Structures are given as structure tokens and as C-alpha cells.
């Protein structure tokens, strides 16, 4: 395969994703989102061909002619068409990669629909979770992508906080970012709830007032 070795997206994939999967034996991999470039598909398929695995790629656009390999099954469907997709998948998967609709509600839906298929100690990776490159005056500078990725980032933190005994969560900020969830348990995930933080508590207000006056006193004494 002729994989393009340029770009931060590839660097992110090689450094944050690939080390988790490169030595999997006979891996069963589910990928949501192919795209015209098909970079992740090419890398994952190369792995499956070398390690006697199977790659299941799902996309609403027809990329079925992109590759010709006995190790690849293309599923021409929406990623949330679970009833159909599930009939083509094995009972358990070694890796899931999501790169389709980058909105918090959709990411949560796909995670909850397919997470139970993942083997324990295996990974579910979600691409595009950093809003920073899309902020004003940054290289991508895009309002909707900034907001979508911001909401997705914090939604994943809420999901983790509600399920911290069932998963680990890591983030990469290379390129447009990615989240890596490691499954720790076969227990069913529960829906996220608000985090009971104390940012807006009366105690924190007193802390801020105290810090403000301490700073004023220090400046006055200087």
C-alpha cells in the first residue's frame, strides 16, 4: 500500500492510535467513516492483511471500489443503522474507530450503540475532539467545528465521569485531536449526568474574593 506519510493527521494516527493495534493477531476492526483520502482505512487494512484480520468499514457514501481485499468488508450504510450493521459484524471486536459526524449527540449515540461489541482492554477511538485548531485566529478558524468539537470533548468527559470504573479515557491534541477509550469491563455503560463540580459554589466564590484581596495587598506593599 502507498500510504501518504505527510500531515499531522497521519502523525496523530501513528503516535496515538497505531501503537494500540499494531501487534493484534487476527484483529476484527470496525471503522466508521472512509472518505476519499481513505488514510485510516488504508492503514487499518494494511494491518489486517499482515495480521490475518478483518476490517469492517462503514460509510454513507459508496467507497466499495476503493480497495480490493479479502480482508475488507465495506458496509454502505449510515453509522447509526445498527440493526443492519450488526448482522455483518462478529460478536466481538478488537478496535473501533469513529470519524463520521463530529457532534456530541451523535458521538455519544454511536459509542453507546457499539461499545458492548468491544473486547475488554481494547480501544474505541474518536477522531476530531480538539476545538483548539478551529478557534479564532488559529489555522482552521471555523465556528461550527470549534463548537462541535468543544461540546464533544466535554461530553466525553461526562461519559467517562459516569463510567470511570468501566473505561479509561485519554486525549491527544495532535492536529484536530482524538479521544481514546479503553474498555475495562463488560458492564453496561450508563448515560452521562452533570459533573458535580464546585466552580460556581459559594466556597469557590470566597476563594476568589480572598485571592483578589491578597493580590491587592501584595501589590500595595510592593
Language-model regions, residue ranges each:
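A short alpha-helical cap/connector motif
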Residues: 1-97, 101-222
